[in-house]
């Protein structure tokens, strides 16, 4: 009996060792197979591909990596990874396809938020409006990077002799653009870049409009941006060109005053450069309003005519840049500021063109740029 029990224990021991060795061999083989299916060289770079079930920790790591790469919502990131068997490179491509389709569905939604971006040098400036649906997305670094890149693109596209040129999205949409941002395609078109960002942020994103300004060899371009998340961006922009007659003029003083006038334009909202450039329709419309108001006074026709002319001067002070009270010193007006500057630099200084733009203006009525306040007939 004792012998039988000992023999049984020996046999069981042999069986246990055999099974253990077989299990180790299988485990080693499975590990090697998993390694081969997990690390596949591609163009000299090892890409992680999973041929077997992925652990929870590995899943979370892949979700985190793809989220960092794309800024896409977590649910979309996970869905693409699951669809692509946790292959992160394939999932990134799938995510982009999903995003483009989603962006197309959202393209009809109202996008009245966003940013203005300016790019400029001493003689030229370009400003673009990039819209989105919420101010939250307008604070997104990818959105801001795209807005800045589009302004630089517009500046580079500006032709010689174009002192003032409005443009729509069609000017830039098909142009190639090189984006140096880790979350965006490096080389693409402007339209594809806008669509890619729309897919990334989950909102309707669109390039709405832009303007280009330039000056002569003896002038300067100045700008001011209100509510700036970073330099060259904001919700309201003022730009102005100042022209001088003498090439020896000290332009530093002209630039300084130009920046102040650009800030004035943002604050005072002028519609026209000078009284002579007030459109006939605007002038007649204002006269009609003033006549109606004067008639209720019960005064004589002569008295009412004087009343209308007096109130018309007040209208000019409200909407004509040269007649407006200077926001930095309301005891003088812009015309006097320019006269004083001309004396200081020894050369006559005049305003060539100006622009005031605000994010979302006019969008509720029309997508055209009718909400833009520009330099009347000075265009």
Curated annotation (Swiss-Prot):
Keywords: Elongation factor, Mitochondrion, Protein biosynthesis, Transit peptide. It comes from the Eukaryota. The keyword Mitochondrion applies. InterPro entries: EF-Ts_dimer_sf (IPR036402), Transl_elong_EFTs/EF1B (IPR001816), Transl_elong_EFTs/EF1B_dimer (IPR014039), Transl_elong_Ts_CS (IPR018101), UBA-like_sf (IPR009060). The keyword Metal-binding does not apply. GO terms for biological process: mitochondrial translational elongation. GO terms for molecular function: translation elongation factor activity. Its main location: mitochondrion. It is found in: Mitochondrion. Pfam families: EF_TS (PF00889). Residues 1-33 form a transit peptide. PROSITE patterns: EF_TS_2 (PS01127). GO terms for cellular component: mitochondrion. HAMAP family: EF_Ts (MF_00050). Associates with the EF-Tu.GDP complex and induces the exchange of GDP to GTP. It remains bound to the aminoacyl-tRNA.EF-Tu.GTP complex up to the GTP hydrolysis stage on the ribosome. Belongs to the EF-Ts family. This is Elongation factor Ts, mitochondrial. It comes from Zea mays (Maize).
């Amino acid at each position: 009996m004792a012998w039988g029990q000992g023999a049984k224990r020996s046999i069981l021991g042999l069986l246990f060792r055999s099974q253990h060795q077989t299990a180790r061999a299988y485990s080693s083989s499975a590990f090697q197979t998993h390694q081969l299916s997990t690390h596949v060289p591609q163009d000299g770079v090892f890409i992680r591909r999973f041929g077997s079930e992925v652990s929870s920790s590995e899943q979370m790591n892949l979700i985190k990596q793809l989220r960092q790469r794309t800024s896409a919502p977590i649910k979309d990131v996970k869905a693409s990874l699951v669809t692509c068997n946790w292959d992160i490179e394939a999932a990134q491509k799938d995510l982009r396809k999903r995003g483009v389709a989603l962006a197309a569905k959202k393209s009809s939604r109202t996008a009245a938020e966003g940013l203005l971006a300016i790019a400029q040098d001493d003689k030229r400036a370009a400003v673009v409006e990039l819209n989105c649906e919420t101010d939250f997305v307008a604070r997104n670094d990818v959105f801001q990077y795209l807005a800045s890149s589009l302004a630089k693109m517009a500046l580079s596209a500006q032709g010689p002799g174009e002192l003032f040129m409005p443009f729509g999205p069609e000017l830039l949409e098909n142009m190639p653009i090189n984006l140096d941002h880790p979350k965006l395609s490096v080389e693409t078109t402007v339209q594809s870049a806008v669509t890619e960002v729309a897919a990334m942020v989950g909102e309707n994103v669109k390039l709405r409009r832009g303007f280009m300004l330039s000056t002569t060899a003896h002038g300067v371009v100045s700008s001011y941006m209100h509510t700036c998340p970073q330099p060259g961006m904001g919700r309201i922009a003022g730009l102005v060109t100042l022209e001088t007659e003498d090439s020896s003029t000290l332009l530093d003083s002209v630039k300084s005053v130009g920046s102040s006038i650009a800030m004035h334009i943002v604050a005072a909202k002028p519609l026209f450069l000078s009284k002579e450039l007030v459109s006939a329709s605007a002038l007649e419309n204002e006269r009609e309003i003033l006549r109606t108001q004067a008639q209720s006074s019960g005064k004589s026709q002569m008295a009412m005519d004087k009343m209308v002319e007096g109130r018309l001067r007040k209208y000019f002070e409200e909407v004509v840049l040269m007649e407006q009270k200077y926001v930095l010193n309301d005891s003088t007006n812009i015309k006097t500021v320019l006269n004083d500057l001309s004396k200081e630099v020894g050369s006559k200084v005049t305003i060539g063109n100006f622009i005031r733009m605000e994010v979302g203006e006019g969008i509720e009525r029309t997508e055209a740029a009718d909400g833009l306040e520009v330099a009347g007939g000075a265009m």
